[in-house]
A protein has these predicted regions:
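Long, structured ligand/cofactor-binding scaffold of large enzymes
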Residues: 1-109, 492-546, 551
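Mobile "lid/hinge" segments at catalytic clefts and subdomain interfaces of large enzymes
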Residues: 67-200, 335, 342-431, 587-588
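Short internal beta-strands
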Residues: 2-11, 115-117, 148-150, 180-181, ...
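Flexible loop/turn segments at secondary-structure boundaries
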Residues: 13-16, 54-57, 77-79, 120-122, ...
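A glycine- and small-aliphatic-rich helix-loop capping segment at beta-alpha/alpha-beta transitions
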Residues: 62-64, 83-105, 136, 282-291, ...
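Structured alpha-helical segments in the cores of large, soluble enzyme domains
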Residues: 32-40, 93-106, 126-140, 165-166, ...
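Accessory "access/gating" subregions that flank catalytic or transport cores
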Residues: 23-27, 37, 41, 47-49, ...
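Cytosolic catalytic domains that perform sulfur/thiol-centered chemistry
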Residues: 246, 286, 319-321, 326-328, ...
Length: 604
């Protein structure tokens, strides 16, 4: 079978800090962790225990390498593309196929080439490259495409910077994003104790990167070609509520006034699988040092998420962790945390309009803290830290000044950091458990969080697809977050029937004014939750259909966004277009994904 690992990164809620939060998670989620560990041990899967890190950072440090291919059940799996891996995010059913030596199939993708010229410097980072790409191509511009970065600017960029870019290829809907092998990957492989692999890559370097003719005439080899000059690229901020609404930091102040965004920055958060490398942390802490020397304190809460136990132990050893804490930052557990909605936020009431700035990858409404009025903006960790000291969405650290302890003007100097730790990564226990190929997998029959999957009832094409009632019509975005919310619902991911109670809770229904609600098309009962209506129809032996507009199922690869509708009686979706993973997941669950022949029919 294909080598497989299990990672526990979604269920640790950020509340008070890493140590206490991890203890609370292990107590609260014990039966889930025990189940995952026992399944991994019995069936030969490597197990990365809770607190070991976010899957993509752990994979980058241990598995990602040039010339390999992998699939992962998370949309940000293409993070590994920064190391020259073809890494594709898939749903669970597709992953099971691969795990059991069945073929993985996807639509033949088109190829997009993005030529990077120049070199990153000053305030501009790899995050600004992908934020610029998202702004250019939009959240559906990469659908059905593989994006390859090439050129001088790609070759002189650090390996971890490359991972930041390919990670957020998920935000443009790309099948995957990747870089060809170059000399910047070699030191990272060796620093992460993979010298033999580094030697092999050097030996086969010519086979692991494009021929010179591709760079000389990219239009001959790619279906689309775009170019970004890193010498002139400005730092970007995207949001709110979508990762493709971008502008330069210099344009942000005017837009705050124009759009009426809350100016005060209510929270600043750095880390996540997108930006938690040693380079990210050292560049960010360089700004903390400048502020400390000037006697300037952060004007908002600052939360720091190390991506893995390796990163955590290394920045702790090097004193970086202490510098963040001395500046008032809260260091969170090595997990997804607020990025996936696992944030016990007490400083803001639901319904209070506020602005937060993160170095994360996704910023849909309600995603981070469950508050629909929280406006989530995304930028580089360097910009997030600097703006935390400014305390305002209008503060531009490239040009604006603050007052130091003596009342004099203080202006941040550009951040500086180390690509790799000078003293190496710490050799501490990273949290990996070798499978024993023994034991039993046990699920309590009374568990509210775990249940064995049962086969769905067989459908009769002659009668089960006739005269289907319409459950709802999505208005605006209909991401996987809208279909199956994360946050507190993540604890039910192992129990299909219970988690189905969140189906469409976040979706806006064109037929009803209240989010997640509608009217029963059969009984006529009004103002009910859509999941309750669906359950009622299913229990009467009736299927139903849902309608949506463009790029339905954008965002997370969570398979529950397809499993829940199937479990609750959905026979088909009809939409103008689909995100790749969601469309594949629907097909795997035998829910038909139809597309309007005429897009205007959606509005009829």
């Amino acid at each position: 079978a294909v080598p497989t690992t299990v990672h526990c990164d979604h269920l640790i809620q950020a509340a008070t800090g890493a140590a206490a939060d991890l203890v609370a998670a292990e107590e609260t989620n014990k039966e889930v962790y025990d189940f995952l560990r026992s399944a991994a041990m019995k069936y030969g899967m490597g197990f990365w225990k809770p607190g070991s890190g976010i899957i993509h950072q752990v994979v980058y440090e241990n598995y990602a390498c040039p010339g390999t291919m992998m699939v992962g059940t998370d949309s940000h799996t293409p993070n590994a593309g920064g190391m020259g891996t073809i890494a594709i995010g898939v749903g669970g059913a597709d992953a099971v196929d691969v795990m059991t030596n069945q073929p993985f199939m996807t639509k033949m993708p088109k190829l997009v080439g993005i030529k990077l010229t120049g070199k990153l410097s000053g305030w501009t980072s790899a995050k600004d490259v992908i934020l610029r790409v998202a702004t250019m191509l939009t959240v559906k511009g990469g659908t059905g495409k593989i994006v390859e970065y090439f050129g001088e600017g790609a070759r002189n960029m650090s390996a971890t910077s490359k991972g930041t870019i390919t990670n957020m290829g998920a935000e443009i809907g790309a099948t995957t994003s990747t870089f060809g092998y170059d000399d910047m990957m070699d030191p990272y492989l060796r620093a992460t104790d993979r010298g033999p692999i580094a030697d092999l890559c050097k030996q086969y370097a010519e086979q692991l990167r494009s021929d010179a003719s591709v760079e000389a005439d990219p239009g001959k080899y790619y279906d689309e070609v775009h170019e970004i000059d890193l010498n002139t690229l400005e730092p970007h901020i995207v949001g709110p509520h979508t990762p493709d609404l971008g502008r330069t930091v210099s344009a942000m102040s005017a837009e705050v006034d124009e759009k009426g965004y809350p100016e005060k920055l209510s929270a600043a958060l750095i880390g996540s699988c997108t930006n938690s490398s040693y380079e990210d942390m050292t560049r960010s802490v360089s700004l903390v040092r400048q502020a400390k020397a000037a006697g300037i304190k952060a004007q908002t809460s600052l939360l720091v998420t190390p991506g893995s136990e390796t990163i955590y132990q290394t920045i702790k050893r090097d004193g970086i962790l202490q510098e963040f804490e001395d500046a008032g930052a809260t260091v969170l557990a090595n997990a997804c945390g607020p990025c996936i909605g696992q944030w016990k936020r007490d400083d803001m009431k639901k319904g209070d309009k506020n602005s937060i700035l993160t170095s994360y990858n996704r910023n849909f409404a309600k995603r981070n803290d469950g508050n629909p009025e929280t406006l989530g903006f995304i930028s580089s960790p360097e910009l997030v830290v600097a703006m935390a000291f400014g305390g305002s969405m209008k503060f531009n650290p490239l040009t604006d000044s603050l007052k130091d302890k003596d009342g004099n003007d203080f202006k941040f100097q550009p951040p500086a950091g180390e690509v790799l730790p000078p003293n190496g990564y710490t050799p501490q226990d990273a949290g990996y458990e070798v499978p024993t190929m023994s034991g039993e997998v046990v699920i309590s029959p009374t568990s509210e969080r775990l249940s064995f999957l049962e086969p769905f009832a067989k459908q009769d094409p002659a009668k089960d697809y006739q005269d289907l009632p319409v459950l709802f019509k999505a208005k605006g975005k209909c991401t996987t977050d809208h279909i199956s919310q994360a946050g507190p619902w993540l604890k039910f991911r192992g129990h299909l029937d219970n988690i189905s109670n969140n189906m469409f809770l976040g979706a806006t229904n064109a037929f009803h004014p209240e989010t997640g609600s509608g009217n029963n098309p059969v009984t006529g009962e009004e103002n009910q939750e859509l999941n309750k209506i669906a359950r009622n129809l299913r229990d009467q032996g009736l299927g139903w259909v849902a309608f949506a507009d463009e790029n339905v199922g954008e965002g997370s690869s969570r398979e529950h966004a397809a499993m829940e509708p199937r479990h609750m009686g959905c026979r088909a979706f009809v939409a103008n277009s689909y995100a790749r993973i969601f469309e594949a997941n629907l097909k795997k669950q035998a829910v038909l994904p139809f597309t309007f022949a005429d897009k205007a029919d959606y509005d009829k």
